[in-house]
């Protein structure tokens, strides 16, 4: 009986083919792990290089036309997008890695002992970036002593405010903490922790805000808590759009950890020691015995590690700087589709023309991928896509054809003012506002800032109210 010839598992290579096979294997592994697309022709092989793909130019104009196919490859098919170093708040200052300098003499008070030897100290004060500090006009602070002198306090008092004397790096009770804690019920579900600094710490944080953080510009797309910007400027770029995509960041302030705050101050040019002290002065660690009102561990969990406190004067500015890279990337992505992007605190908004509607199926996951890559999370239940036939609202302002407030809100406030004229000014204070008159005046001023015509009608009614009745 004749047996069939068995084929070898690996074919025999001719001379010169072994090198080509090896290089092909290397190229396959590179595509597998790095996501680099394989060139389809010799011309593409020759033109391919190591430069950044043109699709990710973050400086493209807002009005740039979208790609012809309205489609960008999914992020996993290309190299990771990286923001230029000067635009990205990083823990490294400059390109050279700075090593810890060990000395036997105490370089400054409260210097940390070396782990290897208790007779030596680590000097973290010799790596400040004078050029970066000068660029923003920031005060030069090289040691904790200089920081305390700038704050007008003794070094011991500043060290006490940083919480370095707390057991296990956190206060054991609310009385020992430097913050007042108050739980507020959210509009949808759950609770939010408000952490208001006590008098001395609030004064220190206010000086850090005025003397350092206010001198550092936020990204142009950030409109929340930025001078000369408001909810109106945040909504204006989206007027007349065919679609509006609204995303919400979950636990925006608690998701900014202590390490990220230190990295912000390092990127501004401060040495590691001063950046750590500034980071501890502007972050919070909740007491060990603090419980949530609903008794759920998940409610307290986001606040367990040291984080940005909602209620501190420095938190909005630091939150904007922590999201700087997020703003750069989302703004660049929107520009590639001919869309627009703005952010007001934790509210992200993208909008675009009708020709970019087919790309929505990729814009949404792409934007959420960027958010996750920047170590934030989105609230899926608050994600909205509003078309032209719907009422498109951005931070409470209707943007379908022009900037205005909703008709329902106008009618409600008009009815309250009319009843105040008929029955007296305090008769309609059903919510129990401490100063109902100022409350109504503030709502009317809000209307005047957005829609002056409707605001004037409300103002005329307000002036007819008899507040002595």
Explain the meaning of each model-derived region.
Residues 247-249:
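Residues immediately flanking
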Residues 340-344:
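Short beta-strand
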């Amino acid at each position: 009986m004749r047996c069939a010839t068995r084929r070898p598992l690996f074919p025999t290579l001719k001379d010169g083919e072994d090198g080509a096979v090896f290089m092909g294997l290397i190229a396959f592994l590179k595509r597998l792990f790095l996501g680099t697309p394989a060139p389809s022709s010799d011309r593409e092989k020759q033109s391919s290089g190591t430069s950044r793909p043109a699709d990710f130019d973050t400086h493209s104009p807002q009005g740039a036309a979208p790609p012809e196919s309205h489609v960008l490859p999914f992020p996993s098919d290309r190299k990771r997008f990286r923001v230029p170093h000067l635009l990205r708040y990083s823990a490294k200052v400059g390109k050279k890695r700075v090593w810890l300098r060990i000395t036997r003499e105490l370089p400054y008070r409260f210097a940390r002992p070396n782990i290897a030897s208790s007779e030596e100290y680590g000097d973290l004060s010799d790596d400040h970036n004078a050029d970066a500090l000068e660029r923003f006009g920031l005060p030069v602070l090289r040691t904790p002593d200089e920081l305390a002198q700038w704050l007008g306090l003794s070094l011991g008092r500043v060290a006490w405010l940083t919480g370095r004397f707390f057991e296990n790096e956190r206060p054991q009770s609310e009385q020992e903490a430097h913050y007042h804690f108050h739980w507020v019920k959210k509009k949808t579900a759950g609770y939010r922790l408000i952490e208001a600094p006590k008098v001395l710490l609030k004064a220190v944080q206010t000086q850090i805000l005025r003397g350092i953080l206010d001198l550092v510009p936020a990204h142009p797309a950030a409109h929340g808590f930025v001078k000369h910007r408001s909810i109106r400027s945040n909504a204006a770029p989206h007027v007349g759009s065919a679609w509006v995509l609204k995303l919400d960041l979950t636990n925006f302030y608690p998701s900014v950890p202590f390490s990220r705050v230190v990295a912000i101050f390092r990127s501004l040019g401060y040495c590691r020691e001063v950046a750590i002290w500034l980071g501890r002065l502007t972050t919070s660690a909740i007491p060990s015995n603090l419980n949530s009102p609903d008794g759920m561990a998940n409610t307290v969990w986001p606040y367990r590690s040291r984080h940005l406190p909602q209620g501190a004067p420095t938190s909005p500015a630091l939150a904007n700087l922590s999201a700087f890279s997020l703003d750069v990337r989302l703004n660049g992505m929107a520009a590639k589709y001919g869309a627009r992007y703005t952010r007001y605190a934790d509210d992200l908004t993208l909008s675009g023309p009708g020709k970019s509607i087919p790309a929505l199926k990729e814009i949404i996951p792409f934007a959420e991928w960027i958010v996750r890559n920047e170590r934030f999370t989105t609230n899926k239940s608050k994600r909205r896509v509003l078309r032209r036939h719907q009422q498109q609202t951005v931070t409470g302002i209707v943007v379908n054809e022009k900037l205005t407030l909703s008709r329902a809100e106008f009618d409600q406030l008009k009815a309250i003012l009319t009843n105040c004229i008929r029955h007296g000014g305090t008769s309609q204070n059903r919510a129990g506002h401490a100063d109902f008159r100022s409350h109504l005046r503030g709502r009317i001023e809000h209307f005047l800032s957005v829609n002056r015509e409707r605001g004037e009608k409300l103002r005329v009614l307000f002036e007819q109210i008899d507040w002595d009745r």
